[in-house]
């Protein structure tokens, strides 16, 4: 196993414990990121469906708005200059909210009316009813455009976040976790090899001690046997071998 396939650590019990904790953390992180990716993908598909639905509705509304504008111009004439002269500020304004999906912040755009309606009484003039209808249809189109912009912004944001999250999930699953597992295997093999070497060394030491003990016991037995043989082989002196006895007088 090359050093590139595993983490470069010194094989020890402490390193084994640390790698096990690291593996557990990586597996937990992988699980959390996987759940996050699933939640984001689900919301992504929901937004995609809403975008398709809104675009379809937008096409119908714009078609209706175009016909309404044509009808209003046919009856009331060209009122573009009058509208431009009476505009002082935007009546439809936009504010932004934030939506949180699995830790990802998505902007949400909403429209609201600011001030009174300048053309509230337009319906009383010539062709005013058609102009009011045209205004309502185009107002609906603006609201749909804002909603579509909000959905597409969320769509792009989620698409980028999902790609990043999936890359992280794949990196943890196919690179980090296998690398930690190979490191654990390497440490376990090294520790087992050390234990076998230590067991063999202790076994040899015990065998050597047994041999030395047996040799000492044998030497002790031989020494004791020699001492016994010396005692049994020592000559017994008789009265004839004692040359210094005093003469006896009768």
Curated annotation (Swiss-Prot):
HAMAP family: ATP_synth_D_arch
One Pfam family linked to the record: ATP-synt_D
Assembly: V-ATPase is a heteromultimeric enzyme made up of two complexes: the ATP-hydrolytic V1 complex and the proton translocation V0 complex. The V1 complex consists of three catalytic AB heterodimers that form a heterohexamer, three peripheral stalks each consisting of EG heterodimers, one central rotor including subunits D and F, and the regulatory subunits C and H. The proton translocation complex V0 consists of the proton transport subunit a, a ring of proteolipid subunits c9c'', rotary subunit d, subunits e and f, and two accessory subunits ATP6AP1/Ac45 and ATP6AP2/PRR.
Purpose of the protein: Subunit of the V1 complex of vacuolar(H+)-ATPase (V-ATPase), a multisubunit enzyme composed of a peripheral complex (V1) that hydrolyzes ATP and a membrane integral complex (V0) that translocates protons. V-ATPase is responsible for acidifying and maintaining the pH of intracellular compartments and in some cell types, is targeted to the plasma membrane, where it is responsible for acidifying the extracellular environment.
Keywords: Hydrogen ion transport, Ion transport, Transport
InterPro entries per UniProt: V_ATPase_D (IPR002699)
Name of the encoding gene: VATPD
Molecular functions per Gene Ontology: proton-transporting ATPase activity, rotational mechanism
Protein family per UniProt: Belongs to the V-ATPase D subunit family.
Protein name stated in the entry: V-type proton ATPase subunit D
Coiled-coil positions: none
Gene3D superfamilies named in the record: 1.10.287.3240
């Amino acid at each position: 196993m090359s050093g590139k396939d595993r983490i470069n650590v010194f094989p020890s019990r402490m390193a084994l414990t640390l790698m096990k904790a690291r593996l557990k953390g990586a597996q937990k992180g992988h699980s959390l990121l996987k759940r996050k990716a699933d939640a984001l993908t689900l919301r992504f598909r929901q937004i995609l469906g809403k975008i398709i639905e809104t675009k379809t509705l937008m096409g119908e509304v714009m078609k209706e708005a175009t016909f309404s504008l044509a009808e209003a111009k046919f009856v009331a004439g060209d009122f573009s200059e009058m509208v431009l002269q009476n505009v002082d500020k935007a009546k439809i304004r936009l504010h932004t909210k934030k939506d949180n999906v699995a830790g990802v912040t998505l902007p949400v755009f909403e429209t609201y009316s600011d001030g009174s309606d300048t053309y509230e009484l337009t319906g009383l003039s010539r062709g005013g009813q058609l102009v009011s209808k045209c205004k309502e249809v185009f107002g609906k189109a603006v609201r749909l455009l804002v909603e579509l912009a909000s959905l597409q912004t969320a769509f792009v944001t989620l698409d980028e976040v999902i790609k990043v999250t999936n890359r992280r999930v794949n990196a943890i699953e196919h690179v980090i976790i296998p690398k930690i597992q190979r490191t654990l295997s390497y440490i376990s093999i090294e520790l087992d090899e050390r234990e076998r070497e230590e067991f063999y060394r202790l076994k040899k030491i015990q065998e050597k001690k047994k041999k030395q003990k047996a040799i000492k016991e044998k030497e002790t037995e031989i020494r004791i046997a020699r001492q016994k043989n010396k005692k049994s082989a020592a000559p017994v002196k008789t009265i004839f071998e004692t040359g210094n006895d005093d003469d006896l007088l009768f």
